Structures are given as structure tokens and as C-alpha cells.
UniProtKB/Swiss-Prot annotation:
It is an enzyme of class 2 (transferase). The keyword Iron-sulfur applies. The active site is at C411 (nucleophile). Its EC number is 2.1.1.-. NCBIfam families: rumA. Belongs to the class I-like SAM-binding methyltransferase superfamily. RNA M5U methyltransferase family. This is Uncharacterized RNA methyltransferase SA1713. S-adenosyl-L-methionine binds at Q286, Y315, E336, D384. InterPro entries: MeTrfase_TrmA_AS, MeTrfase_TrmA_CS, NA-bd_OB-fold, SAM-dependent_MTases_sf, U5_MeTrfase_fam. Pfam families: tRNA_U5-meth_tr (PF05958). The lineage of its organism: Bacteria, Bacillati, Bacillota, Bacilli, Bacillales. GO terms for biological process: rRNA base methylation. CDD domains: AdoMet_MTases.
Length: 453
């Protein structure tokens, strides 16, 4: 193999894209990963890091450009870590995400008879985020900065706009930055673990335009609190809720456990098709409301509900998917380990007049065995776990339950593939549909249908 050393300047042809969106050039089968390089491009690059099994390169010149390369519209794209694919046409982004799923399920796990559908995309893949989490800091000149982190770091890129956030959020961000400066609010400095203001979080109802503004502070005491609220109301008189969240943990976790309502309601309202949901500052709620409706509609299609089925909604959160399915089912049973989420789910069931739902707090693998002992036999089980996927104990419990169908929504297809191999003992993976919940990024959500063999 050719010698490869740091600072070498080389040329080559990009033959693949990684799941992180990096171009791959190979030298005698040894891979070099190069951010922002695209398949079929002939490039010049510099080796910046060499490991035992791979190297990292920096793109210097593109000698032959891909037909899928586009000019990134965001002026911060080269520095900000929020997006990874703005230089790739949207049609090619959707195809790349489908290829990721094919690679996981067919090439690696050999689900050769399972259908992988085209990625469900957006008509306008911008301004889709209904929640923004914006770190606050200071630059070397001791000025207040707000924006998003540089890739793989906690260095804040100061910015005035973000093309994937709701446009209202950037208006709030810029106004808050001005208010913090004017009132000389203490700013948290992560390295020193000192200061007050840590994050600004903004949530909006996609269909209702209700807005919640949350200030995350390092401690409860905040001398300028009332003045900040007054200035926010002057600038945004229609704001629904203003809250203070206290996080003094000095960790990477953005929000703490305690929240105080400073103005307005404790929650905001949003709608998904015909269902209404109360959303608190801590609620898990899908970031992209438009794509969530498409995702849930595909899940209902896979569930094949006629009105006579008993549905178990595991990892149910605030009840969004379960309540979405309730009008089409005989009864929906939801289970979630977070107590506040179950309280929200129960309230949401009342708001939507869903009398055919039951929501219980506990570990899914334990609660569903209790339901089984009570004679509750599900026809369909909904699974929507966090990125780490399902606990193996839960999978084994599910196998003993033997529902006719399992509909599995995942924000991490790699762990979904792992779980699919365990479910294969009794279930046939019929098909997987990727849904583009996060355009311009490498993330892809999937929904899969498993039928009992």
C-alpha cells in the first residue's frame, strides 16, 4: 500500500458516502474520509489525521464536480455543525438516506426479501424545526454570542439566522441577544462553570403558532428576570408562555428538572391532523411536524387498523402516536417510563376525548406482562424507542406476547436493524420506509412493519 502520512497532498475519486455524509476515497482499499466531498468527484485533498484503519482528509480542490453538488445557501454552513448536507441536492439527500437503510437491512443484515421504500421527503426542506435549543456564551471580546456549536465541539458559532429553524425562532434569538446585552445579564461560561444564562429554548406550535420561550439558567436567582420578561412581551406580545428552567448540573444536558412559569401558560398547544396536544418545556415532541404527520400516517397504514384492534403503544411519550391511532382502534394501551410524560398523555387523551385509551407509567417489559396477566392481548404493538433502541429484555417479552403486527419507528436505523435481527426469530420484516425528518442533515427516521410468521 502507498505510504499515507499527515499533511500529504493527494488526488483521488470519491467512491462512496459514509452515514455521516463524508466522501470516501480509497488507496489500496484503505479508506480516507473527506467531509463535503461527493460521489464521483475527482478531488485534491490533504491528509489531516491517520489512524490504523482509516484516515481523515480535508478537501482542497474539486477537479471534477458531481452533478448533485449545489451551493449551500447558509452563510454559516462551513463552520456550523448543525447541517452536514447543504452542499448535496435535496433529491440526492433522499437517495443517500435510502441507501443507508438498504445498506443496513439488506447488505449487512440480509433481509433480502424486505422492501425498502423511497425516502419520504419534504416539498420545502427548510424552516422545519418547531424547537430550537440555542447555547449562549461570550466571545474573546467578552460580547454575548448566541448560535450553534461548531461540529464536534462546544465552540459557539455566533449567528443571526438559521435556515432549518422556524423563522420566528431567529427573531426571538436576536431580540434575546440584544436584551441580555442591554441588561448586562450574567452569561454562563462552560469552561469556568460560572455565570447564569446557559441556553435559550424556543418551541412553537406548527399549526397553532403558539410559542414558548424558555431561559435555561445556572441557578434560580436571576436579578433581571422581570425586566427580561417585560422586554420579551414588548417585542413578542403574542407569546404564549415564558419559562425559566434551572440547570446547575455543569453537564452537557441542556435542561434541568425544575421549571418556573414566568408568564402565561405552563404549556403550548399543537395539532397533528385531527389530534390536539399539550406540550410542556420538557415534553418529547417530534421536531418536524409536517413530516411527523407523514410518518404517523405510514405507521397507521402498517398497523392495518379496522376499529377492532387492541394496540400497545410502548415508549409512548406524551401519547402522540397512540392518540393518533385511537380513533382507528378498539383500545390503545400506552406505557412510558417518564412520569411527567404519562401525565401529559392522560391530559392529551382528555383533550381529544379519547375514551378508549389507557396510559401507565413503568418499564414497558414489566407493564406489558402485567397487562398480559390481565388477559389483554394486543393485535398490534407500536414501538418508538430512543436512539439506543429497545432493551433486549423488552424484545424477548415482545416475542412471548406474539402480536400479529409490530410497527417500529426508529430515529436510529442501526439499532433498529439490530433489534430486527432479534425479532426475526418469530417475525418477518415486510418493509421499511425512511422518512426525512431532518433535511440538510445526515439523520434519517424509519418506520418498519413486522408480521408474525
Amino acid at each position: 500500500m502507498q505510504a499515507i502520512a499527515k499533511n500529504d497532498i493527494k488526488t483521488g475519486t470519491v467512491v462512496d458516502l459514509t452515514h455521516e455524509g463524508h466522501g470516501v476515497v480509497k488507496i489500496d482499499r484503505f479508506p480516507i474520509f473527506i467531509p463535503q466531498a461527493l460521489i464521483n468527484e475527482q478531488i485534491e485533498y490533504k491528509i489531516i489525521k491517520v489512524k490504523k484503519n482509516f484516515a481523515i482528509g480535508k478537501l482542497l480542490n474539486i477537479n471534477t464536480r458531481s452533478e448533485n453538488r449545489v451551493a449551500p445557501p447558509c452563510i454559516y454552513y462551513e463552520r456550523c455543525g448543525g447541517c452536514q448536507l447543504q452542499h448535496l441536492s435535496y433529491e440526492a439527500q433522499l437517495e443517500m438516506k435510502k441507501e443507508q437503510v438498504i445498506n443496513l437491512f439488506q447488505r449487512k443484515a440480509h433481509f433480502d426479501n424486505s422492501k425498502i421504500n423511497d425516502t419520504v421527503g419534504m416539498t420545502d426542506p427548510w424552516r422545519y424545526r418547531n424547537k430550537s435549543q440555542i447555547p449562549v456564551g461570550k466571545n474573546e471580546q467578552n460580547e454575548v454570542i448566541m448560535g450553534f456549536y461548531r461540529q464536534r465541539s462546544h465552540d459557539i458559532i455566533d449567528m443571526e439566522s438559521c435556515l432549518i429553524q422556524d423563522s420566528q425562532h431567529q427573531e426571538v434569538m436576536n431580540e434575546v441577544k440584544s436584551i441580555l446585552k442591554d441588561l448586562n445579564v450574567s452569561i454562563y461560561q462552560e469552561q469556568l462553570k460560572k455565570g447564569l444564562m446557559r441556553h435559550l429554548v424556543v418551541r412553537t406550535g406548527y399549526h397553532t403558532d403558539e410559542m414558548m420561550i424558555i431561559f435555561v439558567t445556572n441557578g434560580k436567582k436571576w436579578p433581571q428576570k422581570n425586566a427580561v420578561v417585560e422586554k420579551i412581551l414588548d417585542a413578542f406580545p403574542n407569546v404564549t408562555s415564558i419559562k425559566q428552567n434551572i440547570n446547575d448540573s455543569h453537564s452537557n444536558v441542556i435542561m434541568g428538572r425544575q421549571s418556573i412559569t414566568l408568564y402565561g401558560k405552563d404549556t403550548i398547544i399543537d395539532q397533528l391532523t385531527d389530534s390536539t396536544f399539550k406540550i410542556s418545556d420538557q415534553s418529547f415532541y417530534q421536531i418536524n411536524s409536517e413530516q411527523t404527520e407523514k410518518l404517523y400516517n405510514k405507521a397507521i397504514e402498517y398497523a392495518q387498523l379496522t376499529g377492532n384492534e387492541v394496540v400497545l403503544d410502548t415508549y409512548c411519550g406524551i401519547g402522540t402516536i397512540g392518540l393518533y391511532m385511537a380513533p382507528h382502534a378498539k383500545h390503545v394501551y400506552g406505557v412510558e417510563v417518564v412520569p411527567s410524560s404519562i401525565e401529559d398523555a392522560q391530559q392529551n387523551a382528555t383533550i381529544n376525548q379519547c375514551n378508549n385509551t389507557t396510559f401507565v407509567c413503568g418499564k414497558a417489559e414489566e407493564v406489558i406482562l402485567q397487562w398480559k396477566a390481565q388477559g389483554i392481548k394486543p393485535d398490534v404493538v407500536m414501538v418508538d424507542p430512543p436512539r439506543k433502541g429497545c432493551d433486549e429484555t423488552f424484545i424477548q417479552t415482545l416475542l412471548t406476547l406474539e402480536p400479529k403486527r409490530i410497527v417500529y419507528i426508529s430515529c436510529n436505523p442501526a439499532t433498529q436493524q439490530r433489534d430486527a435481527l432479534l425479532l426475526a426469530e418469530k417475525y418477518q420484516l415486510e418493509e421499511v420506509t425512511p422518512v426525512d425528518m431532518f433535511p440538510q442533515t445526515t439523520h434519517v427516521e424509519t418506520v418498519a412493519l413486522f408480521n408474525l410468521k
